[in-house]
A protein has these predicted regions:
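Aromatic (phenylalanine/tyrosine) cluster motif
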Residues: 9-11, 25-28, 33, 41
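Intrinsic-disorder-associated, low-complexity terminal segments enriched in Asp/Asn/His/Tyr and depleted
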Residues: 12-18, 39
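N-terminal Rossmann-like NAD(P)+-binding domain of SDR-like oxidoreductases, especially those catalyzing
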Residues: 36-215, 235, 245, 257-267
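Glycine-rich Rossmann NAD(P)(H)-binding loop
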Residues: 47, 215-219, 243-253, 268-271, ...
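Short, solvent-exposed loop/turn segments at secondary-structure boundaries
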Residues: 124-125, 219-223
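Alpha-helical substrate-binding/gating segment
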Residues: 229-241, 253-276
């Protein structure tokens, strides 16, 4: 594959993204080349983009040449996660996606990552967790339908609840307690998956679903409530590392950059059924 800047016209990626350059080159028989180059890049909306995983996705998408609109109400997200981004193709909107979502211009893809995700957060914000999983997903899907955009839902391994099968394959329906304290997160994501598939089947929206397992890495809060940051926090304080139960339990852990690479590949794939990652 020819690298950017080494191709037929010797222009870099920013030049090719510029419509004026594309128009000028159309007079020199380069329109097909330029159209193919420009069409590779998308305008992508990420809800929950200031969160742990969402912010890493912003970085990944920008590195691939796409324009990114980051939307977050900052209930659990933090602008510190995106303050390092100094790219003219990046914009941030503070907004609650349980309300009607308006986005000017074309949107090629929507990645719906808005939701409290750690046990501490969804136990403190149970109603908000249910609302963003239901209303927020509905609003984001409505925008995808309006814009003709591809939609990727960030789901979770928690849709399996307390599984009776190990490891879980995507066709396993799970073992979930809908009225337990974790139920607000589990059921919000199960509903989100159901309405995503309904939009796919009824409205023909091009959808993807990723079921994310335990993820760790930079920008994760030490007081997140999950195992890895808890262990690290205890070690930094010189405390004993707490293991609940008899220690025989298993978890699937994934470094955030590996997860984000998998999410990006799923976004670019033709797979419309849920995919486990982590």
């Amino acid at each position: 594959m020819t690298a950017w800047g080494e191709g037929r016209f010797g222009y870099d990626k920013e030049d090719i993204e510029n419509e004026a350059v594309a128009l000028a080159f159309s007079f020199f028989g380069g329109s097909t080349f330029l159209k193919e180059a420009i069409d590779k890049f998308m305008r992508i909306l990420i809800t929950g983009g200031a969160g742990f995983i969402g912010s890493h996705l912003c970085d990944k998408l920008l590195s691939e040449g796409h324009e990114v609109i980051c939307m977050d109400n900052l209930i659990t997200g933090d602008t510190a996660n995106i303050d390092h981004i100094r790219d003219k193709r990046f914009s941030f909107i503070q907004y609650d996606v349980t309300n009607y979502i308006y986005a000017d211009g074309k949107i090629d893809a929507i990645l719906h990552f808005a939701s409290p995700a750690s046990p501490i957060d969804y136990l403190e914000l149970p109603i908000q967790t249910l609302k963003v999983g239901s209303l927020g997903t509905h609003k984001a899907l409505g925008l995808a339908k309006e814009k003709g955009a591809r939609f990727l839902l960030a789901s979770t391994s928690e849709v399996y609840g307390d599984p009776l099968i190990h490891p879980q394959k995507e066709d396993y329906w799970g073992n979930v307690n809908p009225i337990g304290p974790r139920g607000v997160y589990d059921e919000a994501k199960r509903f989100a998956e159901a309405i995503t598939m309904a939009y796919h089947r009824y409205h023909k929206v091009d959808t993807r679903i990723v079921r994310i397992f335990n993820t760790y890495g930079p920008r994760m809060r030490l007081k997140d409530g999950r195992a890895i940051p808890t262990f690290i926090g205890q070690a930094l304080k010189g405390e004993d590392v707490t293991v609940f139960g008899d220690g025989s339990q298993t978890r699937s852990f994934c470094y955030v950059s590996d997860l984000v690479e998998g999410i990006y590949r799923l976004l670019m794939s033709d797979i419309t059924t849920p995919v486990n990652l982590g």
